[in-house]
Amino acid sequence: MARDYYEILGVSRDSSKEEIKRAYRRLARKYHPDVNKEPGAEDRFKEINRAYEVLSDDELRARYDRFGEAGLSGAAAAASGFQDFAGIGGFADLFESFFTNFAGGGVGYSRSRQGPVRGDDLRFDLKLEFLEAIFGGEKQIRISHLEVCPVCGGSGAKPGTDVKVCPTCGGAGQVRRATRTPFGNFTQVSICPTCGGAGRVLEEPCYNCNGEGLAQTTKKLRINIPAGVDSGTRLRVSGEGDAGRRGGPPGDLYVYLFVEPDPDFQRDGLTIFSQVRVSYLQAILGAKVLVPTVDSKAGLEEEAELTIPAGSQPGTVLTLEGKGVPRLGNPMLRGDHKITLVVEIPTRISSEERELLMRLAELHGERINKRDGFLGGLLRGLAQMPGNREREEE
């Protein structure tokens, strides 16, 4: 019974094509007949090549996952009488192959992997304090990524050893396979399973990168945080992703920002929200009070002066214009700072204060005994407190 192709390569069934390729290249180097002279190594090498040939092809892999080995031998298509079509991936591949062959002289086209390959992009999640997001700054981060191997210089070969022409494809990076169809005999070109399209094989892999040409390394980066960023903002750092292969350009680093909350301020876009507590007398008579702003908390300026209009009600919202968040990309433009008044009613008052309030209530025609009206209700609450009842009894 044939072994499972995923088991042969040592990968799971949900592995990506890149993971399958890495597993194949690692095993191919280990069991290549030019390197491994042990009995059975050649058979193992052929088994590895067959597994990679199937799992690296999306169509073949899908049929293998569904039907197993039978799906590759034509059994899955036998009911339709088209056993010969199984080798070229179904009707879609058949007609694509036919028209490509017609236009290209009888050779199906498959893109070679010998050229430069751009490195992968990377993601890094970065937490910012509330004020860092508002005013920006510089942050130092540490990332792990792939760089060109310093030992082999990216060739993948152990220093002092050669990179040889692939014996399977002769350096072309592609192999041809003749296929018989109802339209005649055609040749299909696919990526060489031995060299993975590189056209070259290693005499001996580099001990530092295991023949990949790239090595995992950690480095520090300084990231410039512009003023006005928020949670979800994405910053691109060009060229700081994984290194490219075969001289390809590196990928980019994408930094995703997450802003931590602040105990004093809330934010919605460019607007800052906070509260200020004032006494009931300040709310009634009006006042000027100092309030903290994001600028003062950051140490950029003193607290701002806020004018409380006379007769302000609890929940009144006052605005400090231009004291909000700088606009991202144009920090000279800023939002506003909205401040909600929280009017504090004292829980204890002195006898003198109570007497003054009672006189004020009488001026307004309040019936103190019944504790009607706003001030009456205030006095009733004050009078019912244990401490105030004791004062009355004295």
UniProtKB/Swiss-Prot annotation:
GO cellular component annotations of the record: cytoplasm
Keyword Metal-binding on entry: yes
Transmembrane segments: none
Keyword Metal-binding: yes
Pfam family of the protein (one): DnaJ
Residues noted as binding Zn(2+) 1 in the record, renumbered to the chain: 149, 152, 206, 209
Biological processes per GO annotation: chaperone cofactor-dependent protein refolding; DNA replication; protein refolding; response to heat
UniProt keyword annotations, A-Z: Chaperone, Cytoplasm, DNA replication, Metal-binding, Repeat, Stress response, Zinc, Zinc-finger
Binding site for Zn(2+) 2: 166, 169, 192, 195
GO molecular function per UniProt: ATP binding; heat shock protein binding; unfolded protein binding; zinc ion binding
J domain location: 4-68
Named cofactor requirement(s): Zn(2+)
UniProt subcellular location: Cytoplasm
Main location: cytoplasm
CXXCXGXG motif repeats: 149-156, 166-173, 192-199, 206-213
Top-level taxonomic group: Bacteria
Zinc finger boundaries on the chain: CR-type: 136-218
Assembly behavior: Homodimer.
HAMAP family named in the record: DnaJ
NCBIfam families: DnaJ_bact, PRK10767.1, PRK14293.1
Domain notes: The J domain is necessary and sufficient to stimulate DnaK ATPase activity. Zinc center 1 plays an important role in the autonomous, DnaK-independent chaperone activity of DnaJ. Zinc center 2 is essential for interaction with DnaK and for DnaJ activity.
Alphabetized PANTHER family for the sequence: CHAPERONE PROTEIN DNAJ A6, CHLOROPLASTIC, DNAJ HOMOLOG 1, MITOCHONDRIAL-RELATED
Name this protein carries in UniProt: Chaperone protein DnaJ
